[in-house]
């Protein structure tokens, strides 16, 4: 039996459940058509002489779901591709304990759940999977509408109008001058009368003492 067919048969018979041995990130990702995607699978055990496989599942996980073998990473040979994938679009490389699946120029038909897997003895160990959704247009985030607060009207008191030109008219000035003259004349008359009365009183007193 060819290795690829054996691998797919083993994946069909395995009970799929997320393992803490292989931690995949992110759990869900949505990208636009023709973009690049990087999916990470971190191994919590030593994989010096082991292989890491990447599979794709196009439908929701179930007992009869089908898995496509995409590529594997081998410590000696590097990336080994499936015969059914475009090699220039799929690459697997290692970064310390992480195994990265790199997909370029993705299409909507590349959408699905991607699993990393290691073949043990006798069981298969799967990661929890990363769901990839490829869309033509990414949804835009609607900006929250700001409530406009009505502006308060400020009541302003009318300013007193400043009088332009001279403060007093010629008529007013004339009346003021006339009033001052009348007061001065009245004061002079009062002083004159007071002096005459005093003189008359002095003359009367002189006659009395003679």
From Swiss-Prot:
GO terms for MF: coreceptor activity; MHC class I protein binding
Glycosylation sites: 102
Signal sequence bounds: 1-21
Topology in the lipid bilayer: Single-pass type I membrane protein
Record's comment on post-translational modification: Phosphorylated as a consequence of T-cell activation. Palmitoylated at the cytoplasmic tail and thereby targets the heterodimer CD8A/CD8B to lipid rafts unlike CD8A homodimers.
Keyword RNA-binding: no
Any one of the GO BP annotations: adaptive immune response
Residues exposed to the Cytoplasmic side: 192-210
Domain of life the protein comes from: Eukaryota
Major subcellular site: membrane
Disulfide bridges in this chain: 41-116
Domain Ig-like V-type residue range list: 22-132
Pfam families assigned: V-set
Side of membrane Extracellular, spans: 22-170
Keywords, comma-separated and alphabetical: Adaptive immunity, Cell membrane, Disulfide bond, Glycoprotein, Immunity, Immunoglobulin domain, Lipoprotein, Membrane, Palmitate, Signal, Transmembrane, Transmembrane helix
Compartment(s): Cell membrane
One Gene Ontology term, aspect cellular component: cell surface
Subunit-structure text: Forms disulfide-linked heterodimers with CD8A at the cell surface. Interacts with CD3D; this interaction couples TCR-CD3 with CD8. Interacts with LCK.
Function: Integral membrane glycoprotein that plays an essential role in the immune response and serves multiple functions in responses against both external and internal offenses. In T-cells, functions primarily as a coreceptor for MHC class I molecule:peptide complex. The antigens presented by class I peptides are derived from cytosolic proteins while class II derived from extracellular proteins. Interacts simultaneously with the T-cell receptor (TCR) and the MHC class I proteins presented by antigen presenting cells (APCs). In turn, recruits the Src kinase LCK to the vicinity of the TCR-CD3 complex.
Name of the protein: T-cell surface glycoprotein CD8 beta chain
Higher taxonomy: Eukaryota, Metazoa, Chordata, Craniata, Vertebrata
């Amino acid at each position: 039996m060819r290795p690829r067919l054996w691998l797919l048969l083993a994946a069909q018979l395995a009970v799929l459940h997320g393992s803490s041995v292989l931690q995949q990130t992110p759990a869900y990702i949505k990208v636009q058509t023709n973009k690049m995607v990087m999916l990470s699978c971190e191994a919590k055990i030593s994989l010096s002489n082991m292989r890491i496989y990447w599979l794709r599942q196009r439908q929701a996980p179930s007992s009869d779901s089908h898995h496509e073998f995409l590529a594997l990473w081998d410590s000696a040979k590097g990336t080994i591709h499936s015969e059914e994938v475009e090699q220039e679009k799929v690459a697997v490389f290692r970064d310390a304990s992480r195994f990265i699946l790199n997909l370029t120029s993705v299409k909507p038909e590349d959408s699905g759940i991607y699993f990393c897997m290691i073949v043990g003895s006798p069981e298969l160990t799967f990661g929890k999977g990363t769901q990839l959704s490829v869309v033509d247009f990414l949804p835009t985030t609607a900006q929250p509408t700001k409530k406009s607060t009505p502006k308060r009207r400020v009541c302003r008191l009318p300013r007193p109008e400043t009088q332009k030109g001279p403060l007093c008219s010629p008529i007013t000035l004339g009346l003021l001058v006339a009033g001052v003259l009348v007061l001065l004349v009245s004061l002079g008359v009062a002083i004159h009368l007071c002096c005459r009365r005093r003189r008359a009183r002095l003359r009367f007193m002189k006659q009395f003492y003679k």
